[in-house]
Amino acid sequence: MKSYTRLYLLLILFISVAFVFDQSTPTFEASDEAWHYGVLREIAAGRGLPVQRVGELTTYRQEGSQPPLYYYIGAALISWIDDYDSLSRYSYNPFGQVGVPGTTENVNMFRHTNLEEFPLTGVTLAVHVLRWFSILLGCGTVALTFFVAEALFPENGNLPIL
């Protein structure tokens, strides 16, 4: 019987780093997170997949044209959450310097309020549930990559951990 201690340690490391990222990144500040949430909100509200229209500014922007499987699963996961504060969360930081190399001040795209503090409610709770779902998917990717490397290079026991 094979020992999967190295895989377990790798998954623990992955989950630890992902959890630190989850807790240290404000709501909607991860890459395109606000727009992905906009797609999920459309589906969870029963409006189906968003329709892309040229020149129309929406809460989902270009993400409305992405493949829908993740969005359908994510919408099901957050459908029970009352996102009463969703539209107010799209409040841009007028002084934000997003994408400016070397910036150390005003690095956030959105304004952040005490709605992001514990206990988690509304949009913040929904975003964290989705992040945890993404971490679970990431664990599957790490494990699958480990097994593929192990199958392709059975003589090199350390390669799958890379």
Where do the language-model regions lie?
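Hydrophobic side chains within alpha-helical segments
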Residues: 35-39, 69, 134
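Hydrophobic residues in alpha-helical membrane-spanning segments
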Residues: 27, 68-69, 155
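Transmembrane alpha-helix boundary and packing residues in multipass membrane permease domains
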Residues: 38, 71, 75, 143-147
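Transmembrane-helix signature of polytopic, membrane-embedded enzymes
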Residues: 5-8, 98, 104-121, 145-162
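Transmembrane signal-anchor helices characteristic of membrane glycosylation enzymes that use polyprenol
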Residues: 4-34, 41-60, 80-88
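Start-transfer (signal-anchor) and selected internal transmembrane alpha helices
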Residues: 1-19, 129-130, 137-146, 150-151, ...
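Short alpha-helical patches at coil-to-helix transitions and adjacent helical residues
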Residues: 33, 66-70, 142
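Interfacial juxtamembrane loops and adjacent helix segments
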Residues: 44-133
